[in-house]
Design a protein with these regions (language model features):
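Feature captures the catalytic cores and cofactor-binding loops of soluble hydro-lyases/lyases
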Residues: 210, 214-243, 247-250, 346-475
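C-terminal binding/interaction regions
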Residues: 250-258, 265-266, 279, 449-508
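Glycine-rich beta-strand-to-loop/alpha-helix junction loops that act as flexible
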Residues: 191-198, 341-342, 417, 440-441
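Residue "hotspots" at secondary-structure boundaries inside conserved domains
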Residues: 327-330, 367
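Non-transmembrane, aqueous-exposed alpha-helical and coiled segments at domain scale
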Residues: 1-312, 408
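Short, charged beta-turn/beta-strand-edge "cap" motif at the junction between a beta-strand
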Residues: 337, 343-347
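Short, structured beta-strand/loop micro-motifs enriched in basic residues and often containing a Trp
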Residues: 314-324
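Short, well-ordered loop/turn sites that connect or cap secondary structure elements
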Residues: 329-332, 338
Length: 508
């Protein structure tokens, strides 16, 4: 029997799914993250998980993005051979992009446009987050099975691939590789591992495995049924025993699950891919059967645990950014929690590159960074009465190569971002007696509530990568690298790896 899929239904389903996953976490992720929160013994990691859970519920209630990076769209289509497409002005992939465009430009909840059409030269933003990455397979049947995902750059950039010898140890490679990924992929999350096929097939297997439901708690409770499930448990436990923890701060839970997908391969080969999924974990599954657009049921409010993060005013230091001095910055200790109030500047990859070019030419910068703090962020556009949309930190290591320049030539005194800093940046921070502060990735809507005013002050043509001035009140951050160059992303995981090795713990 032939099924007719109409263009409008297809487009509306893609757009609706992208809106849905921008503000609703999958139920399985929340259940496993809540369990990790209950088990966590590290105060810093527990606080980070509390922020993620609180942010998640806020986003569900406010229908605003979980993360400011609303991702590059991945769509997996299994198209029944008895399906007929009606009213499609172009191909199926073009229809996917029509849906992406509609979903990302929704005036009630505009999503951040992050896609640049020319990846090597001009890197100009397409303004509507198209094109998507589309995988299509023809299968028997009369329906279209659809998986829609939106993958953030922080986790996608940590993807790994290796071509192993057949006798090489997969477990050893994973345990050696995960620490090199840092915390820019926003753990706690999921690892997807693809084994076999060819290089590109292994990468696709890893990505597809991340679309499966998280079931590690159930798997451990009932025990493995086969070698693959036993390997998943082994990898999950051993990765968590590394002590990396939530946001890389050190703790019991780094991964909530490990997924494995395999395909036949050449006798001389063992291609292995590993792709992490972050704390946003955006994906949805639906089937089009010709009856109309897909409907995705909103999750029950009862899904979320009774976790309501709020600043700890007894343990946190209040900082006035408008009166901040280098001496005060140098007094901060690793792990200190700060509540920032006052004016800060923003800037990320494109802004730093342009600043570098302007300084090289002796040109005047659009803003004075002297005595200022910079926040690595590309916010979502505001709606209704918002000052700014979700505005969580981006991965800071991408700005490492600019750190010496910014501290030495602009008068900048501190930086805010996500995850760890590399050796060169840490040395620059130590040399200039500066500091690096971190916010929690995956808590973008929560963070945005601390921003009371926002205006573009430079490089407006860069869109979300423009330089903004934010006026904030009690914005929560942690001292991640102090003026002596001590990094909590080094000390925290080392401490918790040792603790886990010496104490019996239940790994989430």
């Amino acid at each position: 029997m032939t099924t007719t899929i109409r263009h409008a239904d297809f487009v509306d389903s893609i757009a609706g799914a992208l809106q849905y996953i921008s503000y609703y976490h999958p139920a399985d992720y929340i259940a496993h993250l809540a369990r990790a929160y209950e088990l966590e013994k590290s105060a810093a990691a527990r606080d980070a998980i509390a922020q993620i859970l609180t942010n998640s519920k806020m986003c569900a209630e406010g229908r605003r993005p979980i993360c400011q990076d609303t991702g590059i769209v991945n769509v997996f289509l299994k198209i029944g051979m008895d399906v007929r497409f009606e009213g499609f002005p172009a191909g199926v992939e073009d229809a996917v992009n029509d849906g992406v465009r509609k979903g990302y430009l929704d005036p009630d909840n505009p999503l951040r446009a992050s896609i640049v059409a020319d990846p090597h030269f001009e890197r100009k933003n397409t303004k509507d987050n198209t094109p998507a990455v589309v995988q299509m397979t023809l299968v028997p049947g009369s329906t279209v099975d659809v998986i829609v995902a939106a993958k953030g750059g922080g986790s996608e950039n940590k993807s790994k691939f290796t071509m192993m010898n057949p006798s090489d140890s997969l477990v050893d490679w994973v345990l050696k590789t995960v620490p090199t990924m840092g915390a820019g992929w926003c753990p706690p999350g999921i690892l997807g591992i693809g084994i076999g096929g060819t290089a590109e097939r292994a990468m696709l297997l890893a990505k597809q495995s991340l679309m499966e439901d998280i079931d590690m708690a159930e798997l451990k409770a009932r025990g493995p049924k086969d070698k693959t499930e036993a390997l998943r448990i082994e990898l999950c436990d051993k990765v968590n025993a590394l002590g990396i923890g939530a946001q890389g701060l050190g703790g019991l839970t780094t991964v909530l699950d490990v997924k494995i997908a395999m395909a036949p391969t050449h006798a001389a080969s063992k291609p292995v891919a590993m792709i992490p999924n972050c704390a946003a974990t955006r994906h949805a599954h639906f089937v089009l059967d010709g009856s109309g657009p897909a409907y995705l049921e909103p999750p029950s409010p009862d899904l979320w645990p009774d976790v309501k993060w709020a600043p700890d005013y007894n343990k946190s230091k209040k900082v006035d950014l408008d009166r901040l001095t280098k001496e005060e910055v140098a007094s901060w200790k690793p792990g200190d929690t700060l509540l920032l109030s006052g004016k800060m500047l923003t800037g990320r990859d494109a802004a730093h590159k342009r600043i570098q070019n302007m300084l090289a030419k002796g040109e005047k910068l659009p803003v004075d960074f002297t005595g200022r703090v910079i926040y690595y962020v590309g916010p979502v556009d505001p709606v209704r009465d918002e000052v700014v949309g979700p505005a969580g930190p981006t991965t800071s290591t991408r700005m490492d190569k600019f750190t010496e320049m910014m501290l030495a030539k602009t008068g900048l005194i501190a930086m805010i971002g996500k995850a760890e800093r590399g050796p060169a940046a840490i040395e620059a921070i130590r040399r200039h007696r500066s500091a690096y502060l971190m916010g929690v990735g995956g808590a973008a809507y929560l963070v945005s509530k601390a921003i009371k005013q926002s205006r573009v002050v430079g490089f407006a043509d860069l869109g979300m990568e423009a330089i903004y001035e934010f006026d904030v009140w009690d914005m929560p951050v942690t001292v991640a690298v102090d003026a002596n160059g001590t990094s909590v992303h080094e000390t925290g995981p080392a401490e918790w790896k040792a603790k886990i090795a010496g104490i019996p713990v239940a790994i989430a």
